[in-house]
Curated annotation (Swiss-Prot):
This is Arginine deiminase. It catalyses: L-arginine + H2O = L-citrulline + NH4(+). The gene is arcA. NCBIfam families: arcA, PRK01388.1. It is found in: Cytoplasm.
Amino acid sequence: MSTHPIRVFSEIGKLKKVMLHRPGKELENLQPDYLERLLFDDIPFLEDAQKEHDNFAQALRNEGVEVLYLEQLAAESLTSPEIREQFIEEYLEEANIRGRETKKAIRELLRGIKDNRELVEKTMAGVQKVELPEIPEEAKGLTDLVESDYPFAIDPMPNLYFTRDPFATIGNAVSLNHMYADTRNRETLYGKYIFKHHPVYGGKVDLVYNREEDTRIEGGDELVLSKDVLAVGISQRTDAASIEKLLVNIFKKNVGFKKVLAFEFANNRKFMHLDTVFTMVDYDKFTIHPEIEGDLRVYSVTYVDDKLKIVEEKGDLAEILAENLGVEKVHLIRCGGGNIVAAAREQWNDGSNTLTIAPGVVVVYDRNTVTNKILEEYGLRLIKIRGSELVRGRGGPRCMSMPFEREEI
C-alpha cells in the first residue's frame, strides 16, 4: 500500500479523506460596498451557512469520509515559536497594510493571541481598523494621515470555504496555486505552511506548482479524470502560461499522468472555473453546462522529447472523453436538462458543481431540482444538501472540498 499522505488519482474513486473550511467570522466582515473587491455577489448569513456546512461535513462522514479542516491543519503546522513568528510576518507582508504604525499594531495584536487555532482564524477573518488602538498624532506617518475611510486594516478572506482553489491534489503531489485575485492569493499561505511544516504533510508532498509563480491557476480548473489523464480549464481564473508550467512539472516529476486535456471556454464570472460547468460523476458520465459546448475547444497535451506536444482535439466532446478514458461511450448530462432557462438558473446555483464520493455517488445542492432529477434518471445516487447561504459565494460541493485521499479505481 502507498505510504504517500496525498493519494488522488481520479475524480470518482471512493473518497477516504477530504479537507474543508468551516465558514467563520470572515463572512461577517463582508459589506455591500466592497463585495466586488472580495469576489462576492451577496452576503451569506453566517449562522445558517455554518449549519449548512456542518450538514455537508456530516453527510460526508456518514459515507465513511474522514473530514479534515483547513484551519486546524494550519494551526497544527505552527510547530515552533520561530515558525509561528515567521507565519505572522509573512501574513503581514502579504496583507498590503497601509501605514507603518498600523502594521506594528496588528503585529502586536496577532502576537497576543496565544492559541494557534485562534490565531489562524483571526488571520482569516481580517482586521477592522476599530480593533486597533488609536495612533498618536505625533507617531503617524504620511500614509496614516491621508488614510481613507475604508474600514479594514486587513481584508477578510471570505472565499476560504471554497477549499478547492488555493491548492489542488494531483496524484501524490500538490499544485500550490497562484490565484487570480490578490484577495484570494493570500489564502495559499495556509497551504504553504501545511505542506512545509505540518507533522503529517510537511516535507512529504512534491509541489508541481508554487505560489511564488507570477501566472495564475486555481484548483477549480484542475480535474483528475484518471490515473493517466488530467483535465485543466483555461478560464477567467487560470491562464494558459500557468497550465504549461504545471504540466512540465507534472511530466518531469513523473507524477504518473500521461496526457492532459486542456479545455478552453468562455472567460467570465459565471463560468469562472472548469468545475462550475463540467464535473465527472461516474466512469462514463459527466455533468456539463450546455452553454459552454458551442465554443468549447479541447487540446491534448503530452510530453515528448522533453517538450510539450499540443494537438487540438476534433469532434464531439463525448467521443473525445470516451477515447481518452478508454470507455465505450460517455454520457454528458446537461445542467437543467438543456432547457435554456433552467440551465442558466441551476448553473448559477452550481448545478454542475458536484462532488463525487464514489462511482455514481454524488453530493449536490438540493435546490437544483431539474438537474438532480436527470442525474437520478441516469442511475446516480444523490446525497442532497441544503445550500441557501453557502451558494451565495458562487460555489458548490466540489468547490467546497479538497480530497486528500481516494481509493484507486
